[in-house]
Amino acid sequence: MGFSRYVEVGRVVLINYGPDAGKLATVIDIVDQNKCLVEGPEEITGVKRQVISYRRIALTDLTVPIQRNARAKTLKAAWKEADTLAKWEGSQWAKKLAAKKTRAGLSDFDRFKVMVAKKQKSRIIAQKMKELKE
């Protein structure tokens, strides 16, 4: 299977680092081989229109049907019509990021409780497997 995520107008991207790290944006225009113009839309994702390096973004599978250099109002309407935010939140990538964020916010006692729960789960699975083998 070939590579299918290309930098194109309407491609939804995840910003990796910088002030907008972790936010989604949409490619509005391609500036050159190293940069593109992106916008949130600001009302939905909080990303203002800006030129950003390809090194700072990760391409997602999502695209929004827009024209080159689309206005903010047009972009916002296209996002809502395509239900882009819901599609993103339903993706495995977004779920992994949310889980990572939740894990990072755990206290020491919370991590201990997770460890105990994993041990209990493992013990139950081992018992069931033993019963099935007999």
Predicted regions and their residues:
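Ferredoxin-like alpha/beta domains used as RNA- or RNAP-binding modules
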Residues: 2-9, 16, 28-134
